[in-house]
Amino acid sequence: MKKNYSIRESVFIKDSLNNSFMLFKDNNENLLFNKINIDNSSMIIDKDIMDFSATIDENNRLHLLYLNKSGELIYCTYSENAWHKNLIGRLDIQSNMYKYLTLLIHKNTINIFYATANIINLNLWTIEHIVKNIDNWQKHVVTNIFSDKTLDPFYIDQDEFGNIYLVYSGKESVHYNVYYLFFNTFNKKWAPNPTKISSSFVDNILPYIFVDTQNNVHILWYCSNNGEYLLKYKRFSSIGEDKFHWREIKLPKITGSNSHALMLEKYNRLNILYAERNEIYNLVSNDHGNSWILEDKTSIVNHPLYLVQYYNLSLNRLRHKINHYYGSIDKASISFYCDDFHEDLKEFNEFKAASLKGEKDSVKDDIKDSINLEEKENKAKSQAPKADKKGHKTNQR
């Protein structure tokens, strides 16, 4: 499977007042912040950015974490139309690589995650977890991962109590496997040993984890099968016959993707989104993941495709939960595939497009009027009586 590392990442945040914000890196590695449906203003937060992550807390405060090319790990909060920056520390980017910054907040606890490896040995990666409670920072080594020089992204999620769940893929002997780990928020400890989710006899890559509104844990990944890659799915339930056991559930045949399949919950129905052959497909389950049907699909209209870190405080948390969406960003406008939550964004994008068209038409009319005026002046000059050498006007026929 050819992994699509060209997919770009961004962050979309909607607060409880329906104000929408977007953060993303441009082609010059500037970190941009847009207030989408407020005044459509855009600002550069910082330049030469290596990686970033952002979120919002229950009090509508935006939080941002980013690493720049000077090795500065900077933590920011947004208030009074400004980002307030604090230097957490300096990372040794000359000797080490740092990837997949992830910021997670539960109540007053700040969680920071990243993967790191020494540039001399990029086959051994470590996931580290930094926790802040009040004024104290504490670092945990979550796990070590054997991999090739490129490491698949890890993903995390949390339940309503603040327990954290993590999934990653690592190399065991000659094959890649998918592993799961759990952080207990009450004793502040990670499980000592990861749980293997996949088979050891084939390659398993691109894992994704999702915790639904009922605190059930779901993992998606791709598994090699006779030259193809099939989407696999397991669920860890907190209730029912399979309580506290991992159960594999059969999906319709979904082959060879080069990007992560995503899971989300809308109207208490689980959805699986995946990209394939220039289209986004949407599978739906009405029975908590036991069975799945294809509900719709839509063409990818703009490239690159964006994997959007998604937060929306305006949604009913008892019925909806979305961590990521696939989307499109065009001139500071954002849209989401297989989406029915953002009529305000659609209206704003349509209004913006109409405004731009109006401006273009106005410019065209101004140019046309200028050309017509110039043509009239030239015609008038050509029809005016000419003077002879003595300065007398002569009539032309």
Q: PLM ranges: what are they?
A:
Residues 1-397:
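Extracellular, repeat-based ectodomains that mediate carbohydrate processing or recognition
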